[in-house]
Amino acid sequence: MEFNFASRLDSFEEGIFATLNYKKNELVKAGRKVYNMSVGTPDFKPAQHIMDAVSEAASKPENYKYALADLPELLDAVSNHYAERYGVKGIRHEEIMSIYGSQEGMAHIAMAICDPGDVVLVPNPGYPVFTAGPFLCGAKVETYDLHPENNFLIEFDKIPEEQARRAKMMIVSYPLNPVCVTAPDSFYEELITFAKKYNIIILHDNAYSDIIYGGRVGKSFLSFRGARDVGVEFYSLSKSYNYTGARMSFVVGNQAVIDKFKNVRSQIDYGIFL
């Protein structure tokens, strides 16, 4: 029997990291030494207190039920972390939601924001899901190019006026994967001004702010005045705590965006484990 599948998949092959993992395993089987420069999976173990807490929580039968809402203690911990780590004070529970890793969040949030044909601006180069998520939701993905001559920062004056006016959502990420650059304070201020001018929702992927070297400081988009008015930030435990396989992240920021995203996710899952 011959099936007809969704045409939206015609533009996609298997995810690049799955493909590279297969090739890596084949080389390892052949006795080759492989340095894995593909998906960013830390090869360090999580801190002992983290593993102990997970082990203890996994031994409690009540933790195997549906987690229909985030625990207040969890939301408090996220809010307190943002205050202590980034100086972002006063984040309310309504401005936080847990997700199955930032990859999942980025893949689904366009369902809450974009109608088919809406324009989403994504960086080039950029992480694959920045493009895949909006595209699979029917949005029109348009790239903005990042150049080494400008330290891979967005050149807002190079984004055409007509494109900016059509854009509904814009994905930004600093420190940026795969080019490992950070952004100065003036950049974030310009980003917020740009978003307000064109009424664009900003999604900031903040997965790498705790693994920065050379005297640089990882910052949160939300620490800048007006950020919560224009968007949300994805904060991941994967790289900061060597917690990649457990799939634990948060989306933090604008309550209206998070409320709509909660609505979407309530249709498709029942919360994170532990």
Model-inferred region functions:
Residues D118, A139, F194-I201, A227-D229:
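A short helix->loop->beta-strand "cap" motif at the edges of active sites that frequently abuts
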